[in-house]
Amino acid sequence: ALLAHAGYKVYVVEPNKERLDVIKTGRSFFFEEGLDSVIKLALQSGTLIPTNSYEESVPDSQVVFSCVGTPDNPDGSSNLTYVFSAAEETAKLAKPATIYVQKSTVPVGTGRKIEALFQELNKKLEYVSNPEFLREGTALSDTLFFDRVVVGGDNQAAVDTVMDIYMN
């Protein structure tokens, strides 16, 4: 919502209908101080577009941020089902040179597996890791007043593009 508020055209792909309906009303489906007003303003300006469709959002996107849940498995390891599902859905629809930014906290080596998935699907996407450092209840201020941004990838131009988004 903050990137949309900054003027970027942002699609929010939310497969859960109840959550999507909440976002469409200008609210968050979880409490975060100040977030509802940011969502509402971005919706009103037309820069935030909530959808359940990768088909609507991915083909025209130059940069795709993947921010999905990584719940714990019973053994305590991260369940990466949503991470790989989002990467696959994006890869199927993205144009070449689309920058795919992984925001979710994932184990070391996950990025290489996502890159292998892109190769397996014969897609030339640029993978960038950009883990978020957000605390529940203060995520909005953590995003606005960050003390560091960690961005990494094999393609320097893709990394620079992601950094430019933060600096604007």
Report residues per predicted region.
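Glycine-rich, N-terminal phosphate-binding loop of Rossmann-like dinucleotide-binding domains
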Residues: 66-68, 104, 153-154
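Structural alpha-helical scaffold elements that stabilize or flank donor/cofactor-binding regions
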Residues: 56-57, 93, 143
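Rossmann-like NAD(P)(H) cofactor-binding subdomain of soluble oxidoreductases
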Residues: 71-136
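NAD(P)+-binding Rossmann beta1-loop-alpha1 motif at the extreme N-terminus of oxidoreductases
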Residues: 1-28
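A structured beta-alpha segment of the ubiquitous adenosine-cofactor-binding alpha/beta core
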Residues: 35-62, 72
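Internal alpha-helical scaffold of NAD(P)-dependent oxidoreductase catalytic cores
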Residues: 114-128, 139-168
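Alpha-helix C-terminal capping/helix-to-coil transition sites in glycosyltransferase folds
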Residues: 59-60, 96, 146
